Amino acid sequence: MIAILDYGMGNIHSCLKAVSLYTKDFVFTKDHSTIENSKALILPGDGHFDKAMENLNSTGLRKTIDKHVTSGKPLFGICIGFQILFESSEEIAQGSKKEQIEGLGYIKGKIKKFHGKDFKVPHIGWNRLQIRRKDKSVLLKGIGDQSFFYFIHSYRPTDAEGNAITGLCDYYQEKFPAVVEKNNIFGTQFHPEKSHTHGLKLLENFIRFI
């Protein structure tokens, strides 16, 4: 069974619908025992980094996720679920005295806002994916270099560990990690469930891998 985490983030329906194309053995849940008994975990959704981590910490779900990862089971983060895989983010609530928020820390790197001096922020719409280390990739099998995926975000990873990056995106000549894969940790900055053929192929690859 695949557990799709209910942690208060938005835009969940399209993810559930896309996963259902490849398996009926999944559940949208925040129940700790259900997550512990799952064979894979997906962190979906749109939202803010600080709120996502606040929800995970206050509900004890962070410890449950850590236990899942330590056991070697696959974890897949999408959009905000991708960003919280990293060490920290500067996306904090207005009025907060903190300079950054701690993430799950499974992938080295920090989440920072696009500077937006010469281009529009947020980055919304279709963009090409530059594939790296395709022979090492689980998610990108059968997907061609420069394929288009759908993005919507204002923040991106910086100083990310190179060996974990299997896909990059170029937004106004600023390259940022868009796909990471490290042992049993997987993530995409874009929304595969909104990315039509290529996105659905990526989701299928993950589900077949489990």
Curated annotation (Swiss-Prot):
NCBIfam families named among the record's database cross-references: IMP_synth_hisH, PRK14004.1
Single Gene Ontology BP annotation: L-histidine biosynthetic process
Catalysed reactions, as listed in the record: 5-[(5-phospho-1-deoxy-D-ribulos-1-ylimino)methylamino]-1-(5-phospho-beta-D-ribosyl)imidazole-4-carboxamide + L-glutamine = D-erythro-1-(imidazol-4-yl)glycerol 3-phosphate + 5-amino-1-(5-phospho-beta-D-ribosyl)imidazole-4-carboxamide + L-glutamate + H(+); L-glutamine + H2O = L-glutamate + NH4(+)
Keyword presence, Amino-acid biosynthesis: yes
Oligomer and partners: Heterodimer of HisH and HisF.
GO molecular function: glutaminase activity; imidazoleglycerol-phosphate synthase activity; lyase activity
Domain of life from the UniProt record: Bacteria
Function: IGPS catalyzes the conversion of PRFAR and glutamine to IGP, AICAR and glutamate. The HisH subunit catalyzes the hydrolysis of glutamine to glutamate and ammonia as part of the synthesis of IGP and AICAR. The resulting ammonia molecule is channeled to the active site of HisF.
Name of this chain's protein: Imidazole glycerol phosphate synthase subunit HisH
InterPro entries: Class_I_gatase-like (IPR029062), GATASE (IPR017926), Imidazole-glycPsynth_HisH (IPR010139)
Pfam families per the UniProt record, alphabetical: GATase
Keywords from the UniProt entry: Amino-acid biosynthesis, Cytoplasm, Glutamine amidotransferase, Histidine biosynthesis, Hydrolase, Lyase
GO cellular component, one term: cytoplasm
Subcellular location: Cytoplasm
Organism: Leptospira interrogans serogroup Icterohaemorrhagiae serovar Lai (strain 56601)
Gene that this sequence comes from: hisH
